[in-house]
Amino acid sequence: MSNAITMGIFWHLIGAASAACFYAPFKKVKKWSWETMWSVGGIVSWIILPWAISALLLPDFWAYYSSFSLSTLLPVFLFGAMWGIGNINYGLTMRYLGMSMGIGIAIGITLIVGTLMTPIINGNFDVLINTEGGRMTLLGVLVALIGVGIVTRAGQLKERKMGIKAEEFNLKKGLVLAVMCGIFSAGMSFAMNAAKPMHEAAAALGVDPLYVALPSYVIIMGGGAIINLGFCFIRLAKVKDLSLKADFSLAKPLIIHNVLLSALGGLMWYLQFFFYAWGHARIPAQYDYISWMLHMSFYVLCGGIVGLVLKEWNNAGRRPVTVLSLGCVVIIVAANIVGIGMAN
């Protein structure tokens, strides 16, 4: 396995670790509605950071974006909005299926759709079937899916042992939402594929290869921001028990505390895709769609590890922890199989 591929896998692991940890600051926000908290964090992660970093990277910010036709930018934006819809469905999936089943189904579907639809759309799926490296890579995707399934099973055992139930269990509604979440969340993978002309233009301007994907985030995350912020603001305006004004009428120290923690959560959310861009840059071009598989499987891996570190599994008993550990090992094996496949 080449050093470039190894570093690509490593940066995807770092990005996934940030994704697994980003909600921790949000949990410490006090006396704010979820909608206000999510909006503040989202403004940081989807608007401020993408724009600020792109302004630092690009020699002429406005000239860069105005150089693209609407036919180039619109698919990137719409796929970003597609991801935004998946993001909202994610929370509803947890509500109706519970954390473990919801995450397992949603992540499993988005892993498959986001990874395999890209080469199918690009007409490159034959590379996976007809080459040794491609078949090895496909095997890695399958093993990763098995690993996600094992971790999901561990979560179910934990919830059963600890008496944790879904907020409002509804299998039919939850499965529909989980499938929608999985499909729509893959929009981020499709957006990265559609944004290749933007990456090439950034490279032509002298932007370091590690950073060429970052300017496209202004458009991708702009699409996601409109969906997420629109959803939050509509709820803040229409739901009787929610009030943006009330949330910002608290004591000043508490408001500052909440804003800083929400901003930190937003920063950590953004960092997942900052390092995703680094990992993506190191993956061989013919296998760039594997970035999504690495990110999503590592997200499940890191989520399990973070749960162990935070002692969320302390009262779950030995069997769930053993199954979780097995699932994590399988995901690590999958990453190595994919790496070997890409090297071939």
Curated annotation (Swiss-Prot):
Protein localization: Cell inner membrane
Membrane spanning residue stretches: 4-24, 38-58, 68-88, 101-121, 137-157, 175-195, 214-234, 259-279, 290-310, 323-343
Catalytic activity, reaction form: L-rhamnopyranose(in) + H(+)(in) = L-rhamnopyranose(out) + H(+)(out)
InterPro entries: L-rhamnose-proton_sym_RhaT
GO cellular component: plasma membrane
GO molecular function: rhamnose transmembrane transporter activity; symporter activity
Keywords associated with the record: Cell inner membrane, Cell membrane, Membrane, Sugar transport, Symport, Transmembrane, Transmembrane helix, Transport
Cysteine pairs bridged by disulfides in the record: none
Topology in the lipid bilayer: Multi-pass membrane protein
Function comment: Uptake of L-rhamnose across the cytoplasmic membrane with the concomitant transport of protons into the cell (symport system).
Database matches in NCBIfam families: PRK13499.1-1, PRK13499.1-3, RhaT
Family per record: Belongs to the L-rhamnose transporter (TC 2.A.7.6) family.
HAMAP family: RhaT
Name of this chain's protein: L-rhamnose-proton symporter
Lineage, opening ranks: Bacteria, Pseudomonadati, Pseudomonadota, Gammaproteobacteria, Enterobacterales
